[in-house]
């Protein structure tokens, strides 16, 4: 189990990313727009750098919804490999069966 503080930190990051997503997209569009003046583009770069570090989506980490485990998480289910296996063995995941050949 991950510490509660790590889970809360990740939740806070998700909220920060959602809060700044629209503004970041606008600034990035200005930066890559070749029709904008160099001063406008530079101002957009500076504004983007002044935003909080956690506003970037690349700071997010996929974590297991049940345990908070950061590694071995299946995106499709949002669960870590251990909890996904347990859920599959209980029959909680429809259509998921253990491989046998």
From Swiss-Prot:
GO biological process, one term: translation
Name of the coding gene: rpsN
Name of the protein: Small ribosomal subunit protein uS14
Cellular compartments per GO CC: cytoplasm; small ribosomal subunit
GO molecular function: rRNA binding; structural constituent of ribosome
Pfam families tied to this protein: Ribosomal_S14 (PF00253)
Function in brief: Binds 16S rRNA, required for the assembly of 30S particles and may also be responsible for determining the conformation of the 16S rRNA at the A site.
Disulfide bond found in the keyword field: no
Regions that span the bilayer: none
């Amino acid at each position: 189990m991950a510490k509660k503080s790590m889970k809360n930190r990740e939740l806070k990051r998700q909220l920060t990313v959602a809060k700044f997503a629209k503004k970041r997209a606008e600034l990035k569009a200005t930066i890559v727009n070749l029709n904008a003046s160099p001063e406008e583009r530079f101002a957009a770069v500076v504004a983007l750098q002044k935003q909080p570090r956690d506003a970037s989506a690349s700071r997010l980490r996929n974590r297991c919804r049940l345990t908070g485990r950061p590694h071995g998480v299946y995106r499709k289910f949002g669960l870590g490999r251990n909890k996904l296996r347990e859920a599959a063995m209980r029959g909680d995941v429809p259509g998921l069966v253990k491989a046998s050949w």
